[in-house]
Amino acid sequence: MRWSGAAAAVVLAGTMLPAGYAGEEVKTIAISTQEFVFAPNLVTVHAGQRVRILFSNRGTVNHEFVSPILNAAEDVTVSSQGVRVEGDKIGEVNFAKGKVAALEMTPTKVGTFQFWCAETTAGRSHRDLGMRGAITVVK
């Protein structure tokens, strides 16, 4: 497990789109977090479309986004100081209380991908307390 805050590989790409996506609109999804919920917690996106998810932590504790979709997408970038990198893949996105993190990616695999917060508070998993959801990728 390796932590990286400002590595070039995970710096938010802004409005730049990867090759092959020129002229396509980036779909922006705002997800707010607090104890112990993602809202909305069900999201649908299209395979091949660039997606920007803005996580706004309105809670009183730190939260994070963990999902297998991070391994089922291309050109994954994050604007956050807390990013866990596993090999050459982003493993999770962390966002402190009162902060916003932006995740950009291009989902490539159709399916439903669960997501959750893996933080704990007083020994209790945020995921077990209900902080989870799903992203469905359709054609």
In which residue ranges do the predicted regions lie?
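Bacterial N-terminal signal peptides that target proteins for export
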Residues: 1-7
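N-terminal edge beta-strand
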Residues: 23-51
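Extracellular/periplasmic metallocenter environments
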Residues: 37, 88-139
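Beta-strand signatures of extracellular beta-sandwich domains
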Residues: 64-68, 116
